[in-house]
């Protein structure tokens, strides 16, 4: 009986890893497509602080263009829909976290960055 539970648990872990990997690949494709589309439009500017001339593929740098979920996933925002994406600098994306756009725009952090 215990072997059945162990086997079932192992299968669930494997299934979860497979699903997570597929979801990660889907997110990376959506993110890259959105950023490339925005770059072609000439709009790689942070939606929140207005920092311009952001770059793609500069991981972790202040000038890195990232994709933020306008309506946070935790608040029911669509994870893969470009209609829920905005271009955002790395700093703002890290700071915003699960805040709503209005909460973040009203924060002292953004007020200081914009001034």
Language model: regions and residue ranges:
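Short, charged surface segments at domain edges that flank catalytic/cofactor-binding sites
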Residues: 7-51
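Alpha-helix C-capping/helix-to-loop hinge sites
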Residues: 37, 73-74, 92
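Cys/His-rich metal-chelating microdomains
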Residues: 49-55, 91-95
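Mixed-charge, low-complexity interaction segments
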Residues: 2-4
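Histidine-centered nuclease catalytic patch
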Residues: 52-85
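Short edge-strand/loop segments of extracellular domains
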Residues: 71, 109-112
């Amino acid at each position: 009986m215990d072997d059945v539970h162990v086997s079932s648990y192992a299968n669930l872990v494997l299934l979860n890893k497979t699903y997570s990997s597929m979801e990660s690949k889907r997110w990376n494709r959506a993110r890259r497509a959105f950023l490339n589309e925005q770059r072609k439009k000439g709009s790689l500017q942070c939606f929140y602080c207005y920092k311009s001339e952001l770059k793609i593929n500069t991981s972790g740098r202040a000038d890195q263009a990232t994709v933020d979920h306008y309506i946070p996933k935790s608040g029911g925002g669509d994870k893969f829909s470009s209609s829920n994406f905005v271009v955002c600098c790395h700093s703002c994306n890290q700071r915003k976290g699960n805040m709503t756009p209005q909460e973040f725009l009203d924060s002292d952090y953004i007020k200081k960055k914009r001034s």
